[in-house]
């Protein structure tokens, strides 16, 4: 097991609260049966958007069609942007502390709309010098290509990287790529885990 040189932080529900339901409620959909007819189209377009296969304009136009043109493109963009909520308390301090002695980076399945909103709302992103973004890399976690691209760019052994994510599937994929990894379950548990990997901070 290599000594940790680089710590990689996920964005959603690690650095910031993400509320996927906010998209639907912002458009007035409050019950599962109201949402269900549009779910497949929404998920399909969003995966293409976060994989970098469609532009922001193409994505919003696609959603416009999914919803039968019931909402304006502007309404859809505002609703989609509203998914990004507040910073998670305590994570700025964690990132700053880790950054004193380790390389740090953002690793996120995201898109142009959410990334721009996050830059405006989340000061912690300014502390992370490198941002690995699925829509720019054209590959999403948990595909091995996502992790391999990071390993190639970091130019260190994957065992010297510590990957932090709230989704077990993404954490397991990082381990399969040779990285060390933590499944995020809150700041207190993360601090305990970090001491085990990094020693005193």
Predicted features along the sequence, with ranges:
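Generic structural signal for small/hydrophobic residues in well-ordered secondary structure
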Residues: 10-13, 52, 98, 106, ...
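Conserved Lys-Pro-Asp/Glu-containing loop-to-beta segment of HAD-superfamily phosphomonoesterases
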Residues: 6, 140-168
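Acidic, Mg2+-coordinating phosphoryl-transfer loop and its flanking beta/alpha structural elements
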Residues: 158-194
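Short, solvent-exposed loop/turn segments at secondary-structure junctions
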Residues: 14-15, 20-22, 110-113, 137-138, ...
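Active-site neighborhood of HAD-like aspartate-dependent phosphohydrolases
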Residues: 1-41, 66, 70, 176-177
């Amino acid at each position: 097991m290599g000594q940790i040189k680089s710590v990689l932080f996920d964005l959603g529900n690690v650095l910031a609260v993400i509320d996927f339901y906010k998209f639907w409620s912002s458009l007035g959909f409050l019950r599962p049966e109201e949402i269900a007819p549009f779910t497949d189209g929404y998920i399909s377009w969003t995966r293409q958007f976060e994989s970098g296969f469609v532009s922001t304009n193409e994505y919003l136009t696609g959603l416009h069609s999914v919803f039968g043109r019931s909402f304006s493109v502007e309404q859809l963009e505002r609703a989609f942007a509203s998914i990004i909520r507040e910073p998670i308390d305590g994570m700025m301090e964690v990132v700053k502390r880790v950054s004193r002695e380790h390389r740090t980076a953002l690793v996120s399945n995201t898109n142009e709309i959410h990334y721009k909103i996050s830059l405006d709302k989340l000061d912690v992103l300014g502390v992370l010098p490198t941002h690995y973004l699925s829509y720019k890399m054209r590959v999403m976690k948990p595909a091995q290509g996502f992790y391999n691209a990071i390993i190639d760019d970091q130019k260190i052994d994957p065992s010297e990287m510590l990957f932090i994510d709230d989704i077990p599937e993404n954490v397991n994929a990082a381990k399969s790529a040779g990285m060390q990894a933590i499944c995020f379950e809150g700041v207190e548990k993360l601090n305990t885990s970090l001491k085990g990997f990094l020693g005193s901070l």
